[in-house]
Amino acid sequence: MGCPAVEARRWGDMWLVVAFCLLGHGHAAVTKEEKAHLRSQVLEMFDHAYGNYMQHAYPADELMPLTCRGRIRGQEPSRGDVDDALGKFSLTLIDTLDTLVVLNKTKEFEDAVRKVITDVNLDNDIVVSVFETNIRVLGGLLGGHSVAIMLKENGDGMQWYNDELLHMAKELGYKLLPAFNTTSGLPYPRINLKFGIRRPEARTGTETDTCTACAGTMILEFAALSRFTGISVFEEHARKALDFLWDKRQRSSNLVGVTINIHTGDWVRKDSGVGAGIDSYYEYLLKAYVLLGDDSYLERFNTHYDAIMRYISQPPLLLDVHIHKPMLTARTWMDSLLAFFPGLQVLKGDIRPAIETHEMLYQVIKKHNFLPEAFTTDFRVHWAQHPLRPEFAESTYFLYKATGDPYYLEVGKTLIDNLNKYARVPCGFAAVKDVRTGSHEDRMDSFFLAEMFKYLYLLFSEREDLIFDIEDYIFTTEAHLLPLSLSTANPSSTKKNTTTQYTELDDSNFDWSCPNTQILFRNDPMYAQNIREPLKNVVDKNCPRSPSRLDEISGSGKMPPLRARDFMASNSEHLEILKKMGVSLIHLKDGRVQLVQHANQAASSIDAEDGLRFMQEMIELSSQQQKEQQLPPRAVQIVSHPFYGRVVLTAGPAQFGMDLSKHLAGAQGLVARAEPYSGCSDITNGQAIQGKIALMQRGQCMFAEKARNVQKAGAIGGIVIDDNEGSSSDTAPLFQMAGDGKSTDDVTIPMLFLFSKEGNIILDAIREYQQVEVLLSDKAKDRDLESESGEQKPVENDSQKQALEDLFMTPEEIAELLIVHEEESPVSQPEVPSSDSPSGGDRTSERDITPESQEHKTEETEHSPKDNVQTPPENSEDSTEEKMDNKVQPMESILADWKEDIEAFEMMEKDEL
């Protein structure tokens, strides 16, 4: 259920945006005692994560929290470009240095610095990301040096310190400099720490493209290194890269693209937004002005910010557009990295849109527990992963600092509760593989310790709780601390670019200092709440749609020339009507057609209105069909000893039987193998499966028949395991089990489908432990799930915590039983099946650093070996474009740009904040 969409129009193109309901509620203030309790809770969570890294992973780069071991590059299966952050230099330890001081753990900080000095080697024969190494390692060393000299000067320790971290930072800076050896001055995306660039042994240097954020997020760290050491070459190179990006902006829109050729300066990806691929470029322009005092950085930022608010911002949404056609949106989904932007707007002083976007993001979090990697404009999951990103916590902290509104303390409390409830595991905190099912990924990125706990601790801290004045520092994109005093220390010899022309802007909108908060808030404590109120139901959309121009047309008695429900792509008369309304059809390579409207191509303004109404009807019809035909994935959670809910398998749903989404308790019981294993005839071991969940093998009969047979024998649920040996949700679309063409109302038990790899997890557990109990549910339940015998209780003190950890499986057992789970199917603009549309499309895999599995769920009905598969209409333009050639098609420019949509996340990890 939800609010129907209402329309928004810009000349030349039309699209739909979401309506917002005016309904809100108040909140209670957080007391000082509660803040202290929450602050202590953050410290305990940090100790849990950091302690497990040091105990189980150090000196490895990162902790694998599910298997309780370190992630060492080359010893684990490659995850693609995400592994380029790992350089065998104890990444997590370096990234955490200044966090230790912020959290007042100075003794642990001294120990960590000594370990970095004695143990870390930066001269490894390994190819790393220039961007990630800069923000995480160079930034971590500089942040550690900054707080080390502060502690030494204040007499709070570190008296032995003699700039060792700075010397290491300088060594690393020189190792990164060869990356800038391009005709443009933009850095190569990767470099070999030992051999540099373009040597045979370097194994890198052939790349031609980089993301805007990758090239434009160097100035803070490199300038700080120059100011600390007096060596100007670092700041000069970073400044040259920024100058080049500024010069290559699209002059009419003042926007930059996502990906650029490092040799020619041509834009490879011409879409623009504030999320993945661009985000920290904007951030570093403004922060470079704050740190270095160079007015040109502020002028550039203001020019870009004006373009962002003019074209990209559609409060509370931030939608990507095309740099050469900024009135045309590039996609209908948003990525999670844009969550940093409200915090940047606070630094800019533009509070209202920051509050609006932050509230929208919070509503998404309240629905899914975490912010999915990407979500659509109607707030459905687009990519379901959540690698414990800190951007939303960052913006929450800055909004609280700007407004003092206790509401943001409640938001922070929600983040703490969700992390403990859904991400905490015995060996740290695990990334969420799928926010819908709660399944985990064996991953705890270094930025989780570098940023998340820093922002949460500061959110609940009073000034007296900190051992230094945090206002004397600026945060890098990785939340490392650089002192503002650097603006007067060893200024770079780089000359200011005096030839650059800046766009004339309204001075009233871009004061040289942040706007006066008294003017913004007018002493009104309800200011922020009044902005949030209209957005309270932005996700839970249960309000009526406001009358619109289209409603007036439909109520005027005028008969529309064509209704969406009547449209047939093979009807030439219908196609002629669409052409008159400015609606064109694009035939996709998988046999489907996609509708696009250009209002300026309509025969008249009335025809354009008819076309807009038709497009709205088609979107609503498509959405209705998706809801009817597609079910979200379900979860099979092993809850018996020694698993206790920590192994979650993503399962395909059935279109019949118990609806697990309406039965929150799910179905829990021991599992037993049915005989015959196919489940296609009367069950011969009825006593063995009575009151249990029956395991069956796919094939030989319809799914509904299997369900009826085990239900008749007394089973309380059923799991069908794929008979295709080696199949996995990693490599195959997730099935929906359909009925047999007859009424399935007689089936009342829940039925789920597992691929062979996931099913073998349960079968192996039965062989090992005999009695295996599972929970069938719509999503994974809390990891502190109590077993029937009550072995496991919530952790309330250290002794209970230790007792609990003793009950969990050993790392070896976890390693054997760990699996990878399926991703979310994208949702996008309406597409209608043509008369010759195939029943399904090919699966196209993506690199592992992105939400890699953009498969479409298919409905399975028939028997093995080749089951009949019913495929609902595809609903993702992005997945469609994945199947197209990589070359730009000589078609409408919008189609040429659409093919790039799915590539946006290929740079996701490279612009991590």
Swiss-Prot record:
Its main location: endoplasmic reticulum. A motif (Prevents secretion from ER) lies at residues 910-913. InterPro entries: 6hp_glycosidase-like_sf, EDEM1/2/3, EDEM3_PA, Glyco_hydro_47, PA_dom_sf, PA_domain, Seven-hairpin_glycosidases. Residues 823-895 are annotated as: Disordered. It catalyses: N(4)-(alpha-D-Man-(1->2)-alpha-D-Man-(1->2)-alpha-D-Man-(1->3)-[alpha-D-Man-(1->2)-alpha-D-Man-(1->3)-[alpha-D-Man-(1->2)-alpha-D-Man-(1->6)]-alpha-D-Man-(1->6)]-beta-D-Man-(1->4)-beta-D-GlcNAc-(1->4)-beta-D-GlcNAc)-L-asparaginyl-[protein] (N-glucan mannose isomer 9A1,2,3B1,2,3) + 4 H2O = N(4)-(alpha-D-Man-(1->3)-[alpha-D-Man-(1->3)-[alpha-D-Man-(1->6)]-alpha-D-Man-(1->6)]-beta-D-Man-(1->4)-beta-D-GlcNAc-(1->4)-beta-D-GlcNAc)-L-asparaginyl-[protein] (N-glucan mannose isomer 5A1,2) + 4 beta-D-mannose; N(4)-(alpha-D-Man-(1->2)-alpha-D-Man-(1->2)-alpha-D-Man-(1->3)-[alpha-D-Man-(1->3)-[alpha-D-Man-(1->2)-alpha-D-Man-(1->6)]-alpha-D-Man-(1->6)]-beta-D-Man-(1->4)-beta-D-GlcNAc-(1->4)-beta-D-GlcNAc)-L-asparaginyl-[protein] (N-glucan mannose isomer 8A1,2,3B1,3) + 3 H2O = N(4)-(alpha-D-Man-(1->3)-[alpha-D-Man-(1->3)-[alpha-D-Man-(1->6)]-alpha-D-Man-(1->6)]-beta-D-Man-(1->4)-beta-D-GlcNAc-(1->4)-beta-D-GlcNAc)-L-asparaginyl-[protein] (N-glucan mannose isomer 5A1,2) + 3 beta-D-mannose. GO terms for biological process: carbohydrate metabolic process; endoplasmic reticulum mannose trimming; endoplasmic reticulum unfolded protein response; mannoprotein catabolic process; protein glycosylation; ubiquitin-dependent glycoprotein ERAD pathway. Residues 826-839 have a biased composition (Low complexity). It holds the Pfam family Glyco_hydro_47. Keywords: Endoplasmic reticulum, Glycoprotein, Hydrolase, Metal-binding, Signal, Unfolded protein response. CDD domains: PA_EDEM3_like. One of its GO terms (molecular function) is calcium ion binding. Its EC number is 3.2.1.113. This is ER degradation-enhancing alpha-mannosidase-like protein 3. It comes from Xenopus laevis.
